[in-house]
């Protein structure tokens, strides 16, 4: 797992792609926005939204758009937005489980440096670079909240979309990566 934090400056031999860490505890975490964004992206693929958006994020804002209704839309000014209502899904940051926090605090290494290399396909020039990543098997806890809103249908559409969109996107995420 690698969720990059970027780096203001890179020193020779230094890490140019560190993971995101809590600034107080230095524990790695996964931003809820990264999880939600990946879930949204997977559902846009599943519902074939990328053709109509030219490969961009779907922000049509239409009330019948499952993606915009569940994940939200920047289109908040239209009449359709009033019918759709606010985003239904809230994904909180994923933090280390209690067990893994203890291991981290006891000095167990849960972060590793991996050296990667990209090649220029024309010149074959190598571009080696180190990245930080979480070792396999580390577990995180996270919380998802889903709002069911009555927009004239007693909340039935939101209940249906919980199964069709939220649960399905979590299943797809398990078979994918962040």
Regions found by a protein language model. Give the residues of each.
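RNA-binding basic/glycine-rich loop and surface signature characteristic of RAMP-family CRISPR effectors
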Residues: 1-119, 123-178
